[in-house]
């Protein structure tokens, strides 16, 4: 039996789901692969709860329960720089399931010293290209869950490239939030009402502009482009926002109060698309020539036009899949499916460490 020490950075929605899945399926993974994951640390911006010889199930569940009521993971000053300064007892895996920036250097240092990294956090891979190179050098980082949650998007793309296929174009709708809004708009709901409902249901970020800016889709597009070998920097992909610049500078309360200003323009765009027999979708297109991220009117028979709600769809046009692109489709958001994508990467990484 091979024991793999892990430190998990992030104990929010995805982090909690991942911990629950690991605790629930740990015995099955041990029986199937001869691998046992051992939590030596749980970390977030409030600190680090750690034990070099491994946290007990009781300690893990207590930490999560305390976090749920607003307590920090560790007292001020405990463990110095938290997970960044913690030394694993042997070669192990650092898991980043946060949405925080600024982790790329520390994670790359772990890769350089022989540890592995598994990411659901997009920001380390969508920073400077040099950071992407440092993280992914020698296969030191797996990142399936950064694009498409638990869908096999990154692995499909890598398999196509590894087999010698040549990519022509990726076309994708990869925001569950924006997909939901498009569906609601097509049903006749004003954008203001759709955004408020999505916000109430927790589909959006606390500030919906984080979704409506398109920045999250641009990060995913950049990760896909870099996976294809394109050495792009963040500024090479610009996203079309759903709101004018003037609404980007106001407070959240004012933004929510002024959402009705967007109703008429969006109703007109939806009506125009429907009159043409098409559908309005927020689409990312990636090729060697460049990328575009924004709202597009698609023909009614386009695969992306059939999407409903928060589902994602990724279409890969390649030399081998030229006439009928290879399509990956399914839920592209949700704590459980995202955690499952992280867990699959963890198992694959652990099997490599065991070999």
Residue ranges and their predicted role:
Residues 19-23, 126, 133, 154-158, ...:
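Predominant activation on well-ordered alpha-helical scaffold segments within soluble catalytic domains
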Residues 136-201, 215, 222-223:
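Rossmann-like NAD(P)H-binding beta-loop-alpha module
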Residues 100-113, 120-160:
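Rossmann-fold NAD(P)-binding glycine/threonine-rich loop
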Residues 93-96, 119-120, 141-145, 169-172, ...:
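General beta-strand structural signal in soluble alpha/beta enzymes
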Residues 1-112:
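N-terminal glycine-/serine-/threonine-rich beta1-alpha1-beta2 phosphate-ribose binding loop
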Residues 9, 13, 17, 37, ...:
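Conserved active-site and cofactor/substrate-binding residues in soluble primary-metabolism enzymes
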Residues 184-185, 195-306:
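Substrate-binding/catalytic subdomain of NAD(P)-dependent oxidoreductase enzymes
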Residues 169-174, 179, 197, 204, ...:
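Catalytic, metal-anchored helix/loop core of enzyme active sites in primary metabolism
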């Amino acid at each position: 039996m091979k024991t793999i020490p892990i430190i998990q950075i992030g104990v929010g929605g995805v982090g909690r789901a991942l911990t629950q899945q690991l605790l629930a399926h740990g015995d099955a993974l041990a029986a199937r692969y001869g691998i046992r994951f051992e939590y030596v640390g749980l970390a977030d911006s409030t600190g680090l709860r750690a034990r070099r010889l491994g946290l007990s199930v009781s300690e893990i569940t207590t930490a999560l329960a305390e976090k749920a009521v607003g307590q920090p993971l560790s007292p001020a000053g405990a463990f110095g720089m938290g997970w960044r300064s913690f030394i694993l007892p042997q070669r192990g895996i650092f898991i980043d399931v946060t949405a925080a920036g600024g982790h790329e250097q520390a994670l790359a240092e772990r890769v350089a010293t022989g540890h592995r990294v598994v990411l659901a956090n997009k920001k380390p891979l969508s920073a400077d290209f040099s950071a992407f190179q440092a993280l992914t050098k020698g296969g030191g980082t797996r990142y399936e869950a950064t694009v498409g949650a638990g869908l096999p998007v990154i692995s499909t793309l890598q398999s196509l490239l590894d087999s010698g296929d040549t990519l022509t174009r990726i076309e994708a709708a990869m925001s569950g939030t924006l997909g939901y809004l498009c569906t609601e708009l097509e049903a006749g709901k004003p954008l203001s009402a759709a955004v408020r409902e999505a916000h109430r249901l927790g589909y959006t970020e606390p500030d919906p502009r984080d979704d409506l800016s398109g920045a999250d889709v641009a990060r995913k597009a950049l990760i896909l482009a870099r996976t294809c070998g394109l050495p792009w920097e963040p500024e090479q992909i610009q996203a079309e926002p759903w709101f004018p610049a003037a609404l980007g500078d106001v407070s959240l309360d004012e933004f929510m109060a002024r959402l009705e200003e967007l109703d008429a323009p969006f109703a007109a765009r939806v009506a125009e698309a429907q009159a043409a027999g098409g559908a309005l979708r927020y689409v990312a297109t990636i090729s060697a020539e460049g990328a575009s991220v924004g709202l597009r009117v698609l023909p009614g028979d386009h695969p992306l036009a059939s999407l409903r709600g928060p589902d994602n769809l990724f279409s890969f046009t390649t030399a081998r899949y030229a006439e009928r692109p290879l399509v990956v489709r399914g839920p592209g958001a949700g704590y459980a499916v995202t955690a499952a994508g992280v867990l699959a990467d963890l198992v694959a990484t652990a099997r490599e460490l065991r070999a």
